A protein has these predicted regions:
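Pair of pore-lining "gating" transmembrane helices in MFS-fold secondary transporters
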Residues: 17-45
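Short amphipathic helix-loop junctions that connect adjacent transmembrane helices
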Residues: 42-56
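Helix-breaking motifs and short loop linkers at transmembrane-helix boundaries and internal kinks
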Residues: 52, 103-109
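Short hydrophobic/small-residue motifs within alpha-helical transmembrane segments
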Residues: 65-70, 153-154
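Helix-to-loop junctions at the C-terminal end of transmembrane segments
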Residues: 72-84, 167
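Structural signature of the two symmetry-related core transmembrane helices
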Residues: 85-100
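Helix-loop-helix hairpin linking two adjacent transmembrane segments in secondary transporters
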Residues: 109, 139, 146-180
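Cytoplasmic helix-loop-helix junction between adjacent transmembrane helices
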Residues: 113-151
Length: 180
């Protein structure tokens, strides 16, 4: 191959790798934040309607999640862990915690789930971002970095639209559906 053909072929491979990195991180953030943190928002009216929670307890659940996110964000600075492992575990735990919200109606279980879920979403956000940005820098593909951060918005829009379409099925089905 000529130097130009080699350069073009290498560029194509790097572009494909960069796209995969950015989209993978975007999906991770959509799940961790869009579902793990913010699915509660479109589900809260259904929880209020079916009487499983009142507005005061809904506020407490949101506060537990915020506290967990704060704890998770602060502890990221001291955790010395494999980023990929944290992201994979964070996504799996997000699935489990989301399903748990739909299979119980015990407030203190919900509170614990929201607290832990907040920390997990922070860890997943920070470590997926760090890994993705470092990998994009290695590929000299900085232009893809913004795609990563569309993930939370994609997740929030997705959960909102899905609940608008399937809200008649109830909050429990919504939680379980988002978890699966």
């Amino acid at each position: 191959m000529t130097p130009l053909a080699t350069s073009t072929a290498g560029s194509s491979v790097h572009s494909h790798d960069a796209r995969r990195v950015a989209l993978g991180c975007m999906v991770a953030l959509a799940v961790a934040l869009g579902v793990g943190r913010f699915a509660f928002t479109p589900l809260l009216p259904l929880m209020l309607q079916n009487g499983s929670i009142d507005i005061r307890h809904g506020g407490w659940l949101a506060s537990f999640n915020y506290a967990g996110y704060f704890i998770g964000a602060i502890t990221c600075a001291v955790l010395r862990v494999d980023h990929a492992r944290v992201v994979r575990a964070g996504l799996a735990i997000t699935v489990v915690l989301t399903v748990v919200m739909g299979v119980t109606d015990a407030f203190w279980v919900w509170a614990l789930v929201r607290l832990v879920g907040g920390a997990i979403s922070a860890w997943t956000f920070v470590f997926a971002s760090q890994w993705g940005l470092r990998r994009l820098a290695e590929l000299d593909a900085h232009r893809w970095s913004g795609v990563i951060y569309t993930g939370p918005g994609v997740g929030i829009v997705g959960t909102g639209l899905l609940m608008s379409a399937a809200g008649g099925l109830g909050a429990n089905v919504g939680w379980i559906g988002f978890g699966l």
